Curated annotation (Swiss-Prot):
Pfam families associated with the record: AfaD (PF05775)
Gene3D superfamilies: Dr adhesin (2.60.40.1570)
Lineage top rank: taxon: Bacteria
The keyword Heme belongs to this UniProt entry's keyword annotation: no
Signal sequence coordinates: 1-24
Keyword Signal: yes
InterPro entries: Adhesion_dom_sf (IPR008966), AfaD (IPR008394), Dr_adhesin_sf (IPR037028)
Keywords assigned by UniProt, alphabetized: Plasmid, Signal
Organism: Escherichia coli
UniProt family annotation: To E.coli AfaD.
Name of the protein described by the UniProt record: Protein AggB
Length: 145
């Protein structure tokens, strides 16, 4: 199932949410209102939910943007001026980075029908005016074997 939406955030971030085409994952995202342009490390910019209708063993989510050195950490460009960047990370309770080299995003094991995740500020930073657009993708993990 493919679900797209664009949600404006008061700090000038736009988010597009997508789920994988080959699985039964559904992703929703709700933006958090932020006051001002100063972002503290770990400040929640959005909270998302990935849901799987079919039997599964876990979840995998990632942001479709340039990675910022560590798995689950990203750099999003400002659409007005590309010299302005927003550093974000994806995760939350129960989510962990991939141990497989080259994999991006974070994983969570479990057979629950849904899991909650957060998009957060990665470090203390200033958010310049403009739009920061990125997409979040995800999939339901099924053991093969």
């Amino acid at each position: 199932m493919l679900k797209k939406s664009i949600l404006p955030m008061s700090c000038g971030v736009l988010v597009m949410v997508m789920s994988g085409l080959l699985d039964a994952a559904e992703i929703t995202l709700i933006s958090h209102k932020t006051l001002g342009s100063q972002l503290r490390d770990g400040m929640k910019l959005a909270t998302g939910r990935i849901a799987c209708r079919e039997p599964h063993d876990g979840f995998h989510i990632w942001i479709n943007a340039s990675q910022n050195g560590k798995v689950g950490h990203y750099i999003v460009q400002n659409n007005r001026e590309t010299k302005h960047e927003l550093k974000v990370k994806i995760g939350g309770g129960g989510w962990s980075s991939s141990l497989i080299e080259g994999q991006r995003g974070v994983y969570r094991q479990g057979e629950e029908k849904q899991a909650i995740f957060d998009i957060m500020s990665d470090g203390n930073q200033y958010s310049a005016p403009g739009e920061y657009i990125f997409s979040v993708s995800g999939e339901c993990l099924i053991s093969r074997g």
